[in-house]
Amino acid sequence: MPKKDIHPNWYPDAKVICNGEVVMTTGSTQPEIHVDVWSGNHPFFTGTQKILDTEGRVDRFMRKYGMANPDEDSTKNTKSSKKETSEDSSSKGS
């Protein structure tokens, strides 16, 4: 016999919500479950390719492994050109 008042409430018709729509019902200890991805919009099941980046992890990966956007490369070139200019001016004084 289970002890009383130690188990969570069971909701046999808990709603699973994705993008504001109820996509399915299931049993859970929470009345509503909010998800970003489910089988109806997951790329594996839909046959499409989509990058879902909720916390900037893709950008962090791209920066870490040198696969930055072309816009970011232009800022790197500006920094390196400033170094070249300062080196050129110091060598001219010699």
Swiss-Prot record:
Keyword rRNA-binding in annotation: yes
Transmembrane segments: none
Protein name (record): Large ribosomal subunit protein bL31
UniProt gene name: rpmE
SUPFAM superfamilies: L28p-like (SSF143800)
Disulfide bonds listed in the record: none
UniProt keywords, alphabetically: Ribonucleoprotein, Ribosomal protein, RNA-binding, rRNA-binding
Subunit field text: Part of the 50S ribosomal subunit.
Function, as annotated: Binds the 23S rRNA.
Highest rank taxon of the organism: Bacteria
Family classification: Belongs to the bacterial ribosomal protein bL31 family. Type A subfamily.
Keyword Ion transport (UniProt): no
Gene Ontology CC terms, in alphabetical order: ribonucleoprotein complex; ribosome
GO BP, sorted A to Z: translation
GO molecular function terms noted in the UniProt entry: rRNA binding; structural constituent of ribosome
Ranges of biased composition (kind: Basic and acidic residues): 73-94
Region (Disordered) location: 64-94
Organism: Prochlorococcus marinus (strain SARG / CCMP1375 / SS120)
